[in-house]
């Protein structure tokens, strides 16, 4: 059985090595939507794979909320740029990978699976979609991890 939960946050980033000059050289923001699809067996006692409140409260909400109104920075970006952002912004997330929708989907997938593993409920992340826009998203699946 599959269940899906939608989360939202607002964040800014620069996507180094992008084709678009706007994305490559300018801080810009998105209204991100993150869809998390979980796979598991229906518990006969509850009639659910996992209560949606528990999906939110198992740490996924806190993980994604840490990105809300933050500037997302690639750790390999220019050191002066990183220091300037840290100096002028209270909410900064430094990523190991270039902050593309694809990389965010992979990172979220791994982090969410780690949170779920702590619950010992045999629930797996089937896929994670990171929407940067209404028309564009990246999706990580089990074989991408």
What are these regions (language model features)?
Residues 1-145:
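Charge-rich, low-complexity N-terminal segments
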């Amino acid at each position: 059985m599959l269940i899906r939960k939608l989360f939202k946050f607002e964040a800014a980033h620069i996507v180094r090595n992008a084709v678009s000059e706007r994305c490559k050289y300018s801080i810009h923001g998105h209204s991100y939507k993150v869809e998390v699809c979980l796979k598991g067996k229906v518990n006969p006692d509850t009639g659910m794979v996992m209560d949606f409140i528990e999906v939110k409260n198992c740490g996924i909400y806190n993980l994604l909320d840490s990105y809300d109104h933050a500037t997302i920075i690639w750790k390999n970006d220019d050191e002066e740029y990183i220091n300037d952002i840290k100096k002028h912004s209270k909410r900064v997330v430094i990523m190991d990978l270039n902050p593309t929708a694809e990389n965010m989907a992979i990172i979220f997938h791994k982090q969410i699976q780690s949170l779920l593993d702590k619950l010992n409920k045999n629930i797996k992340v089937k896929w994670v979609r990171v929407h940067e826009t209404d028309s564009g998203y990246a999706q990580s699946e089990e074989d991408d991890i």
